UniProtKB/Swiss-Prot annotation:
A GO cellular-component term linked to this record: mismatch repair complex
Organism of derivation: Azotobacter vinelandii (strain DJ / ATCC BAA-1303)
Protein's UniProt keywords contain DNA damage: yes
Keyword annotations from UniProtKB, A to Z: DNA damage, DNA repair
PANTHER family for this protein: DNA MISMATCH REPAIR PROTEIN MLH, PMS, MUTL (PTHR10073), DNA MISMATCH REPAIR PROTEIN MLH1 (PTHR10073:SF12)
Name used for this protein in its record: DNA mismatch repair protein MutL
Role, per record: This protein is involved in the repair of mismatches in DNA. It is required for dam-dependent methyl-directed DNA mismatch repair. May act as a 'molecular matchmaker', a protein that promotes the formation of a stable complex between two or more DNA-binding proteins in an ATP-dependent manner without itself being part of a final effector complex.
Length: 641
């Protein structure tokens, strides 16, 4: 029997290759590290040249500050960097890179050539490494001010790693996605990407709003920008800005989600949870929201030294960040009105080639416009529309008849259509929407309401209406379901949750950490209708539950809520259960298909949609209405050709 293996130091080459396993996964990983170095160097233009998906060649050239000749050998050494000096620097790091190990890791698994020149140097200098222990030799070279890093034959000395690489096309797609993500992080830098001698991406410096919108459209597609809401909110030292996609512009995969913290692309479960909560009421099951968001915070309150790839971060006050993200997005999604959706978009990219309805085909569900609505606005009253009848020859009710329709509609749908208590008006700073005159009459050409006036009912399911843009199609049941649902939620919020004491308290065995969390949040549980009593270090008693949730499994619900509180600092499970119940009530209490409505009743429903939050989607996330403009209709019938 042999003795125990002796402990010995690893060779520098092996240590670097082990580190490379964490940092260098594929060519895209190399591109990320090199591009981050270029951006940290103050580059205003970055050129990326790729061959065979980045395996044969990956060259990154920039016009940054460059590296001094004496520092070139150190640049290839591990744990050598110019970005931090002390522990205090690490706690407030603002640069994308700071570990000082990327070039050493890359150089251990590839043939690397580093060429650089500073502004005060008479010439450039170059250093090479070939994946083995070798003394770096600095030699003169020809290059302008800036840096060029050339990586050839990736994983040439680690065949096992090379076997795990995908096809050339797949590897290049990953690399191109890295360039796109960094291009969104730095609008002030131009990016040019070439693959096998062909230009794959050319993004010029974006210095103003219009140019930034063009870059977003180039990276995410023109359709995203057309279906996105711009936001900018600043509060308590936090600033959130960017674009959030409308609920109907959702995806089957989470592949159009870009989130940045102080310019650093991150993937964070806390952020994902906050976004998921904000879209919960308006997103169809199995769909994913789209967004490009930038969060700016004090570097001291976020820890970026969590993962070797720096994709993950840790916030000092995660609950505050979560609540800020959720509250901001939830308000923005609820503050869209039909007239906002129908308004021409602001600075956008040049129009893309015609497709869908624009090319003579019927527009798919994913491109349908939608509305969702701000509670701060007054409900629309058709009689108040200015000049509603002037020049409007459609066979639809005049404003006087529309006013009469309100009474008919309220009587028809009583008692569900109870008057709502509108929440207090929020300031533009809090909501991300500029304040000002919000009367619907000021936003519609010719005084015509955003959703127009009803023309007819189709098969007892759809309402056909005419507005200034053309034809509006409304799903009658889905629209009324959302209106009823929002009113039920408002009523519950104003009246509070009534608790129902249990005849026999339910015991709950938990961990001590969960029990401590329950005790800490006892007042929060009380507001939601629960009464929890601690019986021991790891035991709770549920003495009261919300009356609306008397059929729910209270014990499991409390466990799930505590798990969320420990993980994210907040939980929406109780609210989700309540909303699910209210949604069921709204569904059963809404007008059904094949129920014939009069024109006044249809018009009253349209007016209610214009003043109801999130009326663009039903409770299940399906669209409630869509618009076919005159141009769309003309193309369907080949008019003007």
């Amino acid at each position: 029997m042999s003795g125990p293996a002796r402990i010995q130091l690893l060779s520098l080459r092996l240590a670097n290759q082990i580190a490379a396993g964490e940092v260098v996964e594929r060519p895209a990983s190399v591109a990320k590290e090199l591009l981050e170095n270029s951006l940290d160097a103050g580059a205003r233009r970055v050129d990326i040249e790729v061959e065979q998906g980045g395996v044969k060649l990956l060259r990154v050239r920039d016009d940054g500050c460059g590296i001094a000749a004496d520092d070139l050998p150190l640049a290839l050494a591990r744990h050598a960097t110019s970005k931090i000096r002390e522990l205090e620097d690490l706690e407030r790091v603002a640069s994308l890179g700071f570990r000082g190990e990327a070039l050493a890791s890359i150089g251990s698994v590839a043939r690397l050539t580093l060429t650089s020149r500073t502004a005060d140097a008479g010439q450039a200098w170059q250093v090479e490494t070939e994946g083995r222990d070798m003394e770096a030799r600095v030699q003169p070279a020809a290059y302008p001010v800036g840096t060029s890093v050339e990586v050839r034959d990736l994983f040439f000395n680690t065949p096992a790693r090379r076997k795990f690489l995908r096809a050339e096309k797949t590897e290049f797609e990953h690399l191109q996605e890295v360039v796109r993500r960094l291009a969104l992080a730095r609008f002030d830098v131009a990016f040019h990407l070439r693959h096998n001698g062909r230009s794959a991406l050319a993004l010029h410096e974006a210095g103003d709003e219009t140019a930034r919108a063009r870059r977003v459209a180039a990276v995410c597609g023109p359709a995203f920008l057309e279906q996105a809401l711009p936001i900018e909110v600043e509060r308590a030292g936090l600033r959130l800005w960017g674009w959030v996609g409308l609920p109907t512009f959702s995806r089957s995969q989470a592949d159009l989600q870009y989130f940045y913290v102080n310019g650093r692309m991150v993937r964070d479960k806390l952020v994902a949870h906050a976004v998921r909560q904000a879209y919960r009421d308006v997103l169809f099951n199995g769909r994913h929201p789209t967004f490009v968001l930038f969060l700016e915070v004090d570097p001291a309150v976020v820890d970026v030294n969590v993962h070797p790839t720096k994709h993950e971060v840790r916030f000092r006050d995660s609950r505050m960040i979560h609540d800020f993200l959720y509250g901001t997005l939830h308000r923005v999604l609820g503050e869209v009105r039909p007239e906002d959706r129908l308004a021409a978009p602001a600075a956008v990219a040049p129009p893309a080639p015609a497709s869908g309805a624009a090319a003579g085909e019927f527009r798919g569900q994913e491109e349908m416009p939608l509305s969702a609505t701000p509670p701060a606005r007054e409900p629309a009253r058709p009689a108040a529309w200015k000049g509603a009848g002037a020049g409007y020859q459609a066979p639809s009710p005049r404003p006087a008849r529309s006013a009469e329709a309100g009474g008919v509609y309220r009587e028809f749908f009583a008692p569900l259509a109870e008057p709502r208590t509108e929440p207090a008006t929020r300031t533009g700073e809090e909501s991300g929407i500029s304040s000002g005159d919000t009367s619907l009459g000021d936003t519609s050409p010719g005084g015509i309401p955003p959703l127009g006036y009803a023309l007819a009912q189709l098969k007892g399911i759809y309402i056909l209406a005419e507005n200034a843009q053309g034809l509006v199609l409304v799903d009658m049941h889905a629209a009324h379901e959302r209106i009823t649902y929002e009113r039920l939620k408002t009523a519950m919020a104003s009246e509070g949750l009534r608790g129902q004491p249990l005849l026999v308290p339910e015991g709950l065995a938990l961990s001590q950490r969960e029990a401590d969390c329950a005790e800490e949040h006892a007042e929060w549980f009380q507001r939601l209708g629960f009464e929890l009593q601690r019986l021991g270090p790891e035991t709770l008693a549920i003495r009261q539950t919300p009356a609306l949730l008397r059929q729910a499994e209270a014990g499991q619900l409390v466990r799930d809520v505590l798990a969320d509180l420990l993980e994210y600092g907040s939980s929406d499970r109780i609210e989700a259960h309540l909303n699910e119940l209210l949604a069921t009530m709204a569904c059963h209490g809404s007008v059904r298909a094949n129920r014939r409505l009069t024109l006044p009743e249809m018009n009253a429903l349209l007016r209610d949609m214009e003043s109801t939050e999130r009326s663009g989607q039903c409770n299940h996330g399906r669209p409630t209405w869509t618009q076919l403009g005159m141009a769309d209709l003309d193309k369907l019938f080949l008019r003007g050709r």
